[in-house]
């Protein structure tokens, strides 16, 4: 199997999902968007910002937790103070989220080759069909949250479980693509994904329920307000990645001492480290073992 440069399968599934959304909304898409213009525009802008403000992990993973959190918020959003209740079909949520992603890609002027954007769109699409499309005792889960007799803690717990499930799907899809790209085993990629990514990823399960519960009082401002805990988590994770980046730069600098002294050919340590890393990935070693081997080769 040749190495894939683009997540073709996931992109194809995303294209089918967006196409189905457009087809299902072909008769009332414009009126629906106009009726919920404030919420839709706010969500698209926030998805755009979330796709641009990403977290680069030490292993090379690129995460966009704000983008995922905004998508999950759109899925569960109901009553909104000062605006009409966000009672829309699943296709509207999918199109809003995809629009924000496309605009972000256009501003970055680069195509996402990590599979992350496609995985996020697919996870949002799956969640919106579960929340807004599956009947439970005669009502969808989204309709149950509007029933005043439903305890708020039950609503919050259900929404957190739904968002967590979508995040697991996102990580699974990303791990499968990463395993194919790096030519390592899927089991190893899954293990590494759930060792490194959950710190910031699963913090994205909370903003959706928070925004949904406070939107009847706070209105559209509920969307950015609910993201504050996630933003704080992202800042902490970014500092963590900066420490690892500094460590890596220090080791790379030390590896050049033998070159400067004339004991090894130019870039010898770098070539050895890259070869060792590639072999370790082919053998199915985890990210920690691969990194340790790379650092040992550099030194």
Label for each model-derived stretch:
Residues 1-223, 233-237:
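Membrane-embedded alpha-helical hairpins and interfacial helices in multi-pass inner-membrane proteins
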Residues 201-299:
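Acidic/His-rich, divalent-metal-binding segments that scaffold phosphate/diphosphate chemistry
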């Amino acid at each position: 199997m040749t190495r894939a440069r683009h997540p073709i399968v996931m992109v194809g599934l995303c294209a089918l999902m967006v196409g189905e959304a457009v087809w299902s909304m072909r008769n009332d898409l414009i009126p629906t968007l106009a009726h919920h213009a404030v919420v839709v525009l706010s969500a698209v802008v926030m998805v755009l910002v979330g796709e641009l403000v990403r977290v680069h992990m030490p292993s090379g993973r690129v995460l966009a937790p704000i983008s995922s959190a905004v998508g999950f918020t759109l899925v569960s959003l109901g009553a909104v103070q000062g605006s009409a209740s966000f009672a829309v079909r699943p296709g509207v949520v999918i199109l809003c989220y995809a629009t924000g992603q496309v605009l972000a890609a256009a501003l970055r002027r680069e195509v996402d080759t990590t599979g992350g954007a496609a995985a996020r769109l697919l996870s949002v699409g799956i969640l919106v069909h579960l929340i807004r499309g599956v009947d439970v005792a005669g009502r969808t889960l989204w309709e149950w949250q509007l029933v005043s007799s439903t305890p708020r803690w039950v609503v919050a717990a259900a929404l957190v479980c739904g968002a967590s499930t979508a995040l697991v799907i996102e990580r699974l899809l990303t791990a499968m693509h990463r395993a194919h790209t790096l030519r390592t085993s899927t089991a190893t990629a899954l293990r590494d994904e759930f060792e490194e990514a959950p710190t910031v990823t699963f913090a994205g399960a909370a903003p959706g329920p928070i925004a949904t519960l406070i939107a009847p009082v706070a209105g559209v401002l509920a969307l950015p307000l609910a993201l504050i805990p996630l933003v704080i988590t992202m800042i902490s994770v970014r500092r963590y990645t900066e420490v690892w980046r500094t460590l890596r730069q220090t080791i790379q600098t030390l590896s050049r001492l033998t070159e400067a002294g004339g004991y090894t050919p130019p870039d010898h340590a770098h070539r050895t480290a890259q070869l060792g890393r590639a072999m370790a990935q082919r053998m199915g070693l985890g990210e920690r073992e691969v990194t340790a081997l790379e650092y040992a080769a550099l030194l």
